[in-house]
């Protein structure tokens, strides 16, 4: 894992005679081919990516986790509302960062540019090992659970069946994403519309219930009746469970370079999508408690299916199908965006360089998509979905906070750089206070879960110094990596994107500064600066 520009050029240097050959293999060897990621994501598709990634499985799974930890219906609803508001605050911070640093890769790119290569690599490392494979595995398992649950009305579906169907879902959507960016965005648009219709049905049924007088658990004296002893650590875990349901609000930042007019469409999509999702989530949870008691909700393995069975009668089959389609679209959106994160990391030299390549005709990052799919399939061996959600929530909030803190650092160190959007510093401060609350009490309540997440993240430190920072690797190792890259290129028919078309061109100064943070007490000379011509 060497620096991106050197990886892109070494093949062409070794095979200069292939420059005039136009075959896919020759294009792969030359590292060019004139292909680039296309700007095909407009405002509607951008909103579809945000909404589609947020509304995956969380609203259909996490209500159980939120209620269980909150201890009462009223407090659970407050958790949903506050989490939505904090998500909107975080999205405002990311909107400013997204137009200030207009690069794909999202918070990875922001952390790397502000705090340096090691910090950025740790964000990428934990994303590769835990966050995004876990997120996709949870959504895929939820998809299979909602598909199979009607076939097993008196018991839970078998674990082997759940995992097999989840794997089939992942493989199918990986093929779609590898085939065409347009296909992937169309699938996302269609399934986002479908999941909004499913949630609209839930909300409408809830309104009908309220009109009938079925709002026992919404009355204040009943809503705040605790069914367990209040515990501030468990309340923090309730916020983590809720944050999983809002997870994906920052995914559009991963595909900034494929956005049409990102300076306008990135903030517009955020401003439209986050309030919409918050509204839908709060009223969907209100609808749930009009038909189910807290005990019934906690006993259900598929909350939306139980809700449909109680209110739809013979038409109850609509709900599991709607939820399955919703989570299917969630897997598609997560594959689409997380593969761009790995693509961006490889382009910076933080992952194997083959992951920074795209297909010569389809212009899709096939190696990054295959890598994403494989890592998610490996994650499917983990059985406890709610433990996975806790891992994702804690580690995500850790890096969300670091990224938002970077916004303050960037304001201080680079006050004069262009900022098409400039929000009040009160917003990042509010977000960081909430972030600190979650982390402190999560560590107190679940030290083992949080400690495992931190330990996995710290394993990236030696990997960074051996794989990225160490430039003088043995020649046999470099030759092996280059041979493996060439074989992968020919198998996938992929090349490096043409520089300049996506706004990612690098200068010598960019390369020299690659591992240097904007915020550093004293300048440190990059080892590669001596190798620059």
Curated annotation (Swiss-Prot):
The chain crosses the membrane at residues 46-66, 75-96, 118-150, 159-179, 183-211, 232-253, 267-288, 314-339, 366-383, 388-409, 425-447, 448-467. Its main location: membrane. GO terms for molecular function: amino acid transmembrane transporter activity; antiporter activity; glycine transmembrane transporter activity; L-alanine transmembrane transporter activity; L-amino acid transmembrane transporter activity; L-leucine transmembrane transporter activity; neutral L-amino acid transmembrane transporter activity; organic cation transmembrane transporter activity. Residues 1-33, 500-533 are annotated as: Disordered. Optimum pH is 6.25. It is a multi-pass membrane protein. Belongs to the amino acid-polyamine-organocation (APC) superfamily. L-type amino acid transporter (LAT) (TC 2.A.3.8) family. This is Large neutral amino acids transporter small subunit 2. The lineage of its organism: Eukaryota, Metazoa, Chordata, Craniata, Vertebrata.
């Amino acid at each position: 894992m060497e620096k991106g520009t050197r990886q892109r050029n070494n093949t062409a240097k070794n095979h200069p005679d292939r420059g005039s050959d136009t075959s896919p293999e020759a294009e792969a060897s030359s590292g060019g081919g004139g292909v680039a990621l296309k700007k095909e994501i407009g405002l509607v598709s951008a909103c579809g990516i945000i909404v589609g990634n947020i509304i995956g499985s969380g609203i259909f799974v996490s209500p159980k986790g939120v209620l269980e930890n909150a201890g009462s219906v009223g407090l659970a609803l407050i958790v949903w509302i506050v989490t939505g508001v904090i998500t909107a605050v975080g999205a405002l911070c990311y909107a400013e960062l997204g137009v200030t640093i207009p690069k794909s890769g999202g918070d990875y790119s922001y952390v790397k540019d502000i705090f340096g290569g090691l910090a950025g690599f740790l964000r990428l490392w934990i994303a590769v090992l835990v966050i995004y494979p876990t997120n996709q595995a949870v959504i895929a398992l939820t998809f299979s659970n909602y598909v199979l649950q009607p076939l097993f009305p008196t018991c839970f579906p078998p674990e082997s069946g759940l995992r097999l169907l989840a794997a089939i879902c992942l493989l199918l959507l990986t093929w779609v994403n590898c085939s065409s960016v347009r296909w992937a965005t169309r699938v996302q648009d269609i399934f986002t519309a479908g999941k909004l219709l499913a949630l609209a049905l839930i909300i409408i049924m809830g309104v009908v219930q309220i009109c009938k007088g079925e709002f026992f658990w919404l009355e204040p004296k009943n809503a705040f009746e605790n069914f367990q002893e209040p515990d501030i650590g468990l309340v923090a875990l309730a916020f983590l469970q809720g944050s999983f349901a809002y997870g994906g609000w920052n995914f559009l930042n991963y595909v900034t370079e494929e956005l049409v007019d990102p300076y306008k469409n990135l903030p517009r999509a955020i401003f439209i999508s986050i309030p919409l999702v918050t509204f839908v989530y709060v009223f969907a949870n209100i609808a749930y408690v009009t038909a189910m008691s807290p005990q019934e909700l906690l006993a259900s393995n598929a909350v939306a299916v139980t809700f449909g069975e109680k209110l739809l009668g013979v038409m109850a089959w609509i709900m599991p199908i709607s939820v399955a389609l919703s989570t299917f679209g969630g897997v598609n959106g997560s594959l689409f965006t997380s593969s761009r994160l790995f693509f961006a990391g490889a382009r910076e030299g933080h992952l194997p360089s083959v992951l920074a390549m795209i297909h010569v005709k389809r212009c899709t990052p096939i190696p990054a998509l295959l890598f994403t799919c494989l890592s998610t399939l490996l994650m499917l061996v983990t059985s406890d979905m709610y433990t996975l959600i806790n891992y994702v929530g804690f580690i995500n909030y850790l890096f969300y906070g670091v990224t938002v803190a970077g916004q303050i650092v960037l304001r201080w160190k680079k006050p004069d750089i262009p900022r098409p959007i400039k929000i009040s510093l009160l917003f990042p401060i509010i977000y960081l206070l909430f972030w600190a609350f979650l982390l402190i009490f999560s560590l107190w309540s679940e030290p083992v879960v949080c400690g495992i997440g931190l330990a996995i993240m710290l394993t990236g430190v030696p990997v960074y110094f051996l794989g990225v920072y160490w430039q003088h690797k043995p020649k046999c190792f470099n030759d092996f990596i280059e041979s493996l890259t060439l074989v992968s290129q020919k198998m996938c028919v992929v090349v490096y994107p043409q520089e300049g078309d996506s706004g990612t061109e690098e200068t010598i100064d960019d390369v020299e500064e690659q591992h240097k943070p904007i915020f550093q007490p004293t300048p440190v000379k990059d080892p590669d600066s001596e190798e620059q011509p």
